[in-house]
């Protein structure tokens, strides 16, 4: 179930029972001369979507804008700073937790996202935003 394809009332009903949500992260960058620019996001979203269908969970909108400065010489690459990515991920994750999702699973498809994701998870574990929920 894609979160963006449901109403807020449907979400409210679904998260009455302890419920998690899965979010895919990837990148928008080159993958060779014939590879798709969205490969990392497409792959992580495909995996996340498969899990959500089997686990009856929501799939959050994917985050495909991530640190990829090393690929900026290739047209079509979109890169944001690690700090911007961390801020975006933290705010999105905090929003989901505040609305009642018990946990957020992150399926990552881009190597440069690993450290920023770890940083955000550490911040959420030590903040009130997590409120005993887990990422």
Predicted regions, residues:
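Short catalytic helix/loop segments, enriched in acidic residues and glycine
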Residues: 40-52
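Active-site histidine-anchored catalytic micro-motif
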Residues: 4-6, 65-127
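Structural motif
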Residues: 19-21, 57-58, 105
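Single conserved hydrophobic/aromatic residue that forms the stacking wall/gate
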Residues: 125-135
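Active-site and ligand/interface coordination hotspots across diverse enzymes
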Residues: 1-35
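Short loop/turn segments at strand-loop or loop-helix junctions that form parts
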Residues: 25-26, 62-64
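Glycine-rich loop at the start of a catalytic domain that most often binds anionic cofactors/ligands
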Residues: 35-41, 73-76
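Short glycine-enriched loops at secondary-structure junctions
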Residues: 57, 63-66
